[in-house]
Each structure stands twice: as C-alpha cells, then as structure tokens.
Curated annotation (Swiss-Prot):
The modification Phosphoserine is found at residue 514. The lineage of its organism: Eukaryota, Fungi, Dikarya, Ascomycota, Saccharomycotina. Keywords: Cytoplasm, Phosphoprotein. It is found in: Cytoplasm. This is Uncharacterized protein YJL016W.
C-alpha cells in the first residue's frame, strides 16, 4: 500500500536551462552539455545489445550505392547558386552524393538531414533535373533511365538508413526500458502526456514548446464530416507555453487519424556516425516524426518565438544557467542576439504521464494548414534523468497516439512484421535490407499512386514504398537470406576507405582500424534479443495493469526514479 500511495504523489524536479544566443549562421546541435544530459552512466548491456545496429550504421555510411563511369553517360550538375558544370564522376556513398569535375573539385551533399541542412530530405523532378533538398543540388543526365536509377538508389539508401534507426529505437526502448522502475506505467498510460520540448521550424531554428497529448471533444467532432475537420479522438498538440491548452495557444498539432509513417530516435550527425558508441548515444537527442503535421492557420511564428525559446546557435560555454539568468537579458538587446525564454524561465516540475482517470477535453481545431515534411523534436532533459530515459518517456506517447508499431496495445516485435520497429533488420554479417537481385527489380518496379495520396514527402514515400516491397519479398521468398545475394560487413568495410578525403573514393588494399574495431566475433542476433526484452517489458506492464484493475492510479504526474 505504501508503494501505491507514493505513486499518487507528484515528484517535482527543478530544472534550469543553458543560456543561448540566436544566430542566423550557425547551429549548435549539442546545445545541452553532456554534464546536464547524462547524469547517469549508460549501462554496459545497452552497448552490448546495440553493437550490431551500430555496425549496420557504420556499414551504411560506407556503402557505395552508385558510382558513374566515364563511358556511361554525361552528367551535369547545378549548385544552389545556379552554376552548372559537367561532372567527371558521381557517386552515392551512404547518404552522401560525391561529385568531382574536371578540375578535381568535390561537392559533398547529404541527401538526408545534416547539421547544415536540418529537417531536409527532398528529391523531386524539376524539368530535366533531379533536385535535392529544395535546390541545394540539381543533377541531370543524358540517359534518363540512368538518372531514374540514381534516384531510386538514393531512396533505397534513405530507406535503409531510417530502418536502421527504427531498429535502434526499438532496441534502446527495450534494453534501457527494463531499467526504468515506472516503465509499466508509461506503457499503460496511453493518450496522457505533457512535457516541454524543442521543435525545429524552418526559418526559425529550435523553438521551445509545450507538448500535450489528450482528448478532443466528441460533440464537436460529430458536427462535420468534412475532410478538413479535425476528427481525431486524441491529438498531439504543441503550445506556445503551458499556461493554456486552448486552440488559440496551439501552434501545430497531429490528430490520431492523421497520416504518420514513422517515429524514431534520431541523430542529426548520423550521416557520419562516430566510431565511439558512447559519443554516439550522447548525440542521440532527437525524435524524428515522418508524416503530416497540421499548423494552425492563425499562428504568427514571430509570436511563437517571442513567447517561446530559440535555440539555434552555440552554447555560451557556461553550461547550465539558472532560469533567473535567462530573465536578466537587457531590454535593449537586438533581435539578432536576444535570448528568448518562456514565461517563468521554464521552471518545470516534471515530465508528465497524466493519470488514467483525470483527463481534460479540448475543442477541435478546424482552421489549419497541413505540412507533409514531418517534425524534428528534441525532448528537454531533466536533472537526475539520463536523456535516453527522457526520450523513451516522450516517444512512447507519440507512438500511442499515432497507432504505430502495435501501440497503444502491445509492441510488435517480429522482424517479419511490417508494423514492427525491427522490420527487415539484416542479420549480421549481412548488411543489406535488399538482395542484389531485388535491387535490380526495384529499378523498374511500378508503385501504386493510390497508396501515396496521403503525402508527397520523400522520406514518407520512401518508407511506404520500400516497406511494402520488402514485405512482399519476405512473404514470397522465405529463404531469401540464404538463396539470394547480400553484401556482408567485410564486403563494405574492407573494400572502401571509411574516411572521406574530399577528393575521390579510394579502394583499399588493407582493412583499416575500423574493421578491426568492429570485428564480427560477436554475431549476436539483435532482433531476437530485442524481441525478448520488449516482450518482457510488456509482460511486466500487463501484470501491473492486471494487479491495478480494481484500483486505478490517481496521480497528476509520473514518479521519476
């Protein structure tokens, strides 16, 4: 009974935020120092179970998906300034397009997010050009069939990259979640969550907002059958501050019936993963939502900035600063250098998993604009709680509301299940999601446009198209892992230099140190280990739910160990 009584008491955690200045030219993605992000050391078992996935990320960064030859075709490249030149060679190395011209200069452009190009993953056809990231780079070829092949290989690279991160997300949730004393409460508390976070907005940078998942009014939902009406029973809403959950205070939202393809942990520097796993996990600070987001039509983003926080530049070097310091900005500070802050300096009480019984009801928002390029979220750390724990507490309610990966009922864990975070995960030493024979077929595969009516986003279309194809292949060819040809870890890491020297891709006669570092002596099956741990988490949650069925929890906040 003492334990149950303790669950009713809210736990207040005082938090202070580091001080930031606003800059239009530089963005520091490690704005929170390691000391404030990581109060506790990472458990050794986390490194052990995630090592195979870490190897897959290393292999992906070194895969050559495409490499042109002089006799193949003529390639012309247009940079962001509009300058057009003929390329000597074009390669797709991991998620980077490497271009050389006759003067041996190199262009290196990431086709997914990078520190200099946040929340950008766009491939489109503009006239005769294949355009990347809204004109950052455009490529054309006199062989249009070859250009289409290049486009599809770019999409395969994106698919594999995101799929590895989805598997990493499932592995971190299952392994680290077992250490969280109240994980059963998190799993049994769908549609009840509120906490501060930062979101990245184009043209604004990182903005601090109040995230709230709750119920919307049923009576208002039934008034209209219009497609433009927000009809979701539950919604993820992001507010300017935590003072009001009215529609006027809402900036953007995601109903539970809106299209969301995927949600997973993310590292903006992931295109060039660190060789040090501890550094990698310290950089794993974001949540990527691939899908549609509804922006309130009357939102003034300048107003959001003034009432929230912009974290778009370097840390001032002082580490954590008190909320009082945040409030001591000079009133004469110019907009360019001013540090914005939320009301009351953002002094939080805790991350909130609200009770199962005390819910509020919001009115639906009917005046909005839908954007399809998803959302990049950075949960804010709590003192005494590792940032990975804060990430887990944040991402599961998002998955619940989006109805992804079996949630809010039970995580799907099988690698053959298209709705699982572990779907299609290669078994080392193989590092490919698709066999060579399947990739050849994908170059001419027709995709059903009727299945793609919900989005025009490159990342969402990529995950939808290639997940469906992979599911079809796994169903038809049960022994594809042994009957078809897949590249292995040594094929990728042993043939190509793991460092990019910005001149050209060099073959290697000997394996470098990274190959020795990631030896395959520990051929662990991360998929089965993660499945076992995820199942144990869910057993614990079900047992707890059964034991509490006659006495529901009544608490305003979740207990945090």
């Amino acid at each position: 009974m003492g334990i149950l009584d303790s669950l009713k008491k809210p736990v207040n955690i005082k938090s202070s935020l580091p001080k930031f200045s606003r800059s239009a030219t530089s963005i520091n993605l490690s704005s929170h120092p390691v000391s404030s992000r990581s109060f506790l050391e990472l458990p050794p078992e986390l490194f052990s179970i995630t090592k195979p996935i870490f190897k897959l990320l290393q292999a992906h960064a070194n895969k050559i998906y495409f490499q042109s030859s002089d006799a193949e075709a003529v390639w012309n490249v247009k940079d962001s300034s509009g300058h057009v030149f003929e390329a000597e060679s074009i390669s797709l190395l991991g998620s980077h397009i490497i271009i050389t011209n006759s003067s041996v200069q190199v262009a290196d452009v990431a086709i997914i997010d990078s520190p200099s190009n946040i929340n950008q993953c766009e491939i489109s056809s503009v006239g005769e050009f294949l355009q990347f990231n809204n004109g950052q780079l455009s490529i054309t070829c006199n062989d249009f069939g070859l250009l289409e092949k290049f486009k599809r290989l770019c999409m395969i690279s994106i698919f594999e990259f995101i799929s590895i991160y989805k598997a990493l997300t499932g592995t971190v949730i299952s392994s680290y979640g077992l250490r969280m004393s109240d994980m059963h409460i998190i799993l049994n508390s769908p549609f009840n969550f509120k906490d501060w976070c930062e979101v990245y907005l184009d043209g604004q940078g990182w903005v601090k907002v109040w995230c709230h998942i709750d119920k919307v009014s049923k009576t208002n939902n039934s008034k209209s059958s219009s497609d433009n009406d927000a009809k979701g029973k539950y919604q993820i809403r992001f507010y300017r501050d935590d003072k009001s959950t009215s529609s006027k205070n809402c900036v953007f939202f995601i109903p539970d019936n809106e299209y969301v393809q995927d949600i997973f942990f993310y590292n903006i520097n992931a295109a060039e993963p660190s060789k040090n796993m501890n550094d990698f996990f310290q950089g794993l600070q974001m949540i990527k939502l691939v899908g549609n987001v509804r922006f309130c039509s009357d939102t003034d983003f300048n107003d959001v900035v003034d009432s929230g926080s912009i974290y778009s530049s370097a840390n001032n070097g002082s580490g954590d600063s008190s909320s009082t310091a945040l409030n001591n900005e000079s009133p004469n500070t110019t907009p360019k250098s001013r540090t914005f802050f939320s009301p009351k300096g953002h002094r939080r009480n805790s991350s909130h998993v609200s009770s199962l019984t005390s819910r509020s009801t919001k009115k639906p928002i009917t005046n909005f604009t839908t954007r399809t390029n998803g959302l990049l979220i950075r949960p804010l750390p709590h003192h005494g709680v590792h940032h990975l724990e804060a990430m887990i507490r944040f991402i599961i309610p998002l998955m619940d509301c989006a109805r992804l990966y079996g949630r809010p009922v039970q995580f799907k864990t099988e690698r053959t299940d298209i709705n699982s975070l572990m779907f299609g995960l290669p078994k080392l030493p193989s590092v490919d999601y698709f066999a060579e024979e399947e990739i050849a077929h994908l170059m001419t595969q027709e995709f059903n446009p009727l299945k793609e009516k919900d989005t025009d986003d490159t990342m969402a279309l990529t995950m939808s198209r290639f997940s469906s194809y992979l599911q079809e292949r796994m169903t038809k060819v049960s022994k594809r892992n042994t009957e078809l040809n897949f590249r292995t870890f040594s094929d990728v890491m042993g043939m190509y230099n793991t460092t990019r020297d910005h001149s050209k891709l060099n073959c290697m006669s000997d394996k470098d140190n990274s190959v020795k570092e990631f030896s395959l002596s520990d051929k662990s099956n991360v998929s089965s280990e993660t499945t076992n741990m995820m199942n144990q988490l869910q057993v614990n949650a079900h047992e707890y739910k059964s034991s509490m069925c006659e006495r529901p929890i009544v608490a305003s906040t979740s207990p945090i160990a």
